[in-house]
Regions:
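N-terminal cap/lid segment of alpha/beta-hydrolase-fold proteins
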Residues: 30-61, 401
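Secretory targeting and sorting signals
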Residues: 1-29
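Short alpha-helix in the alpha/beta-hydrolase fold that links the catalytic acid
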Residues: 242, 256-264
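Short beta-strand/loop motif that positions the catalytic acidic residue
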Residues: 240, 245-248
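Short substrate-entry loop that stabilizes the transition state in hydrolases
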Residues: 57-63, 68-103, 253-256
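Accessory cap/linker subdomain of secreted extracellular hydrolases
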Residues: 140-142, 151-239, 310-311
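C-terminal, loop-rich substrate-recognition/catalytic regions characterized by aromatic stacking residues
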Residues: 274, 282-283, 288-517
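Gly/Ser-rich "nucleophile elbow"/oxyanion-hole loop immediately N-terminal to the catalytic nucleophile
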Residues: 55-62, 107-115, 121-143
């Protein structure tokens, strides 16, 4: 119950923002040229929507169409500020409330087949009732709307371009990476769905099974998630040749960057990938209020090029654009591989045993709050590395760096683990450690195992969540491993222990990706 209360508090600002916007439709309709409509979605389910058209629409010509499905828990007026801006530059813009939320009918399908079919019905309606150009159709969204946009593009070749903002490529790898439940992230989604929507029996069953840690239902949960993952339909997306822009945040606690980057690398059509500091949807949130915003500016440029044919240069820029958590400038790369091209290995020498079931003090933070603090104040979660109790935390450190180290991409941990029980969970953290021993969190990731023989060593490979962070000269990097973190559900039997070793024929290490100096 405490966890759900925390989750509710974490999203309260988001819901308040949605509520404030939700009070304004009548005024907007009267003064802003917004038309509110009902659209029959899949199976006749009513979808509440609004349409904004260019001011110079005269019925003699057609305009490119952009469809905007709403975010999880947001009302249909979420995108009005951006819709008006896009309409002013010549687009027909149709925003609609996804099924199961607010005034739209039906139950929450969690980006399932009904949501995909709804998106096609919305496009059908727009082509029949607005001056939209059937040859130039785009779809964009934030969070839930982003995932639905990608799924719709895989199933509807009419979609020529997509902008996925804080979306996902692999839903399973988002909230179940390392075979570990990301419980705070799931609780946020579950709580918002309960408050602002109508959950289906299927979604309630999936969330209950997710929380319960019932391994007999694991295959069903994974299959459910794969059906809702754009990565499952990559062949269709590539065949359609949809121009896909993806933007996300380094600290996204709902849809971490790794799964988006992996999805991006497998796309073969026109594509662009952007990562910035922040948490889920926080980078693009100001744009929803009409404030200047890099994410929305690039989104409009993307559509201008691929729907209007404007030669604005976006197709000639480096397609991977990153902003470090430590600096304000952007860096360009030809692909995601190039971000991780240079690596430095830190040896995880010796043998160390830790006990489980107790939080050592090393944590990934609190969903939303921690990454927002990192975004606006450069204050990531911290830990006093010398004071971490070695009974519950294994610690390895590099030497001091004579020059600044620009960590870019995905740090990888390789080690050998000997458990005393067949199941267990560990969480690895990479810290930037200053002269006084205070560690600032650079990256982390959980790992859960089942079915191992107690007392028998096994090799473990774990990718930490991707990031861009600058370690100052004179600092060290430290890898900390413990077994409890409030972000995740742990699977350590009471009294279990984990031993980490570094065999001569298979040494343990953490491989840190560094930008070429």
């Amino acid at each position: 119950m405490a966890l759900r209360t925390t989750a509710m508090g974490a999203v309260s600002a988001t819901l308040v923002a949605g509520g404030v916007l939700g009070l304004t439709p009548a005024a907007q309709a009267a003064t802003g040229g917004v038309r509110y409509v009902d659209i029959a979605g899949d199976g006749g389910t009513v979808l509440k929507a609004n349409v904004v058209t260019p001011a110079d629409t005269d019925g003699t010509r057609r305009h490119p169409l952009i469809v905007l499905p709403t975010s999880w828990g947001f009302p249909q007026v979420e995108y009005l500020a951006q819709a008006q801006r896009l309409a002013d530059s010549g687009y027909v813009v149709l925003s609609y409330n996804v099924r199961g939320f607010w005034q739209s009918g039906g139950e929450i399908d969690v980006a399932g087949p009904h949501d995909v079919a709804d998106a096609a019905k919305v496009v059908d309606w727009a082509l029949a009732h607005t001056p939209s150009d059937p040859e130039n159709i785009g779809m964009a969204g934030v969070s839930y709307g982003a995932g639905i946009s990608l799924l719709a593009a895989a199933h509807d070749p009419r979609l020529k371009a997509v902008a996925s903002l804080s979306g996902w490529g692999d839903l399973v790898d988002s909230i179940y990476s390392g075979r570990t439940q990301h419980v705070q992230a799931a609780a946020v989604l579950d709580t918002v769905g309960t408050v602002a929507g109508r959950r289906s029996a299927e979604s309630q069953e999936v969330f209950s099974a997710f929380y319960s840690s019932d391994l007999s239902k694991e295959k069903d949960i994974v299959a459910w998630g794969q059906k809702r993952s754009p990565a499952t339909y990559l062949d269709q997306l590539n065949k359609n040749g949809t121009a896909i822009m993806m933007a996300g945040a380094w600290g996204d606690t709902i849809f971490p960057p790794n799964q988006s980057a992996a999805f991006y690398e497998r796309l073969t059509g026109p594509k662009r990938l952007e990562f910035r500091p922040g948490d889920h949807a926080t980078a693009e949130l100001p744009g929803l209020f009409g404030l200047p915003n890099d994410v929305w500016t690039d989104t409009e440029r993307w559509f201008d090029h691929y729907l209007k044919g404007e030669d604005n240069g976006i197709d000639r820029e480096q397609p991977v654009r990153l902003k470090s958590r430590s600096t304000s400038g952007y860096e360009g790369y030809p692909d995601w591989k190039s971000v991780n091209a240079t690596r430095n290995k830190i040896a995880l020498a010796g043998s160390t045993t830790i006990h489980t079931n107790v939080d050592s003090g090393a944590d990934g933070g609190i969903v939303f709050l921690s990454s927002i603090l990192d975004q606006v104040a450069k204050l990531p979660p911290v830990a006093a590395i010398p004071l971490l109790p070695r009974r519950w935390a294994a610690v390895w450190q590099s030497g001091k760096y004579a020059t600044a180290q620009q960590v870019r991409g995905t740090a990888k941990v390789h080690t050998t683990v000997t458990p005393t029980q067949e199941s267990g969970t560990l969480v690895a953290y990479l810290y930037d450690v200053g002269p006084l021993g205070l560690g600032k969190l650079v990256a982390n990731a959980p790992y859960t195992f089942h079915g191992h023989t107690p007392g028998k060593p096994f090799g473990l490979d774990l990718d930490l969540f991707s990031t861009a962070y600058d370690v100052p000269a004179g600092h060290r990097l430290a890898l900390v491993v413990d077994t409890v973190d409030p972000l995740y559900i742990e699977h350590n039997p009471s009294g279990a222990r984990l031993t980490f070793s570094s065999p001569a024929n298979d040494p343990s290490y953490v491989s840190v990706p560094l930008r070429g100096q």
